[in-house]
Amino acid sequence: MEERYGVMVCGHGSRDEDAVSEFLNFAKKLKNQLLQYELDWGFLEFANPVIKSGLDSLREKGIREIMSVPVMLFAAGHAKNDIPSVLNAYQAQYPELSISYGRELGIDLKLIRAAGERVKEAIEQADGDISPEETLLMVVGRGASDPDLSLIHI
């Protein structure tokens, strides 16, 4: 029997229904792009399903190799500590599984290009003339106490 691999998409979670919906839409689109893998998702906090539920689903489908990825822009406390703690606890509970952990999105040229394309789309859809020099794309997070984040400059 051919071994199947699973992908566990880990999100932060939010009390804002729109934020949860955006993550779920992203995860479902990703699932349609990665048809060679079983893919499930879960949130760390504030929303359901939780990460453990996604891991349960993969395990119940017979998946034994799970690649987990945090869908977060930067590596701070949640991506560095909290999600790995959930994964490690699950791994300890089910030692027959192999759970690996990827990295955060980070500053990547593809991400910057995608953001630039989105700005161009917004300019084209805007009423009236707006020059690129009059635009600004600002990404705002709640903030974090992780000292590594203060070192990031674009």
Tell me what each language-model feature is:
Residues 1-152:
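Active-site-proximal alpha-helix that buttresses catalytic centers in soluble enzyme cores
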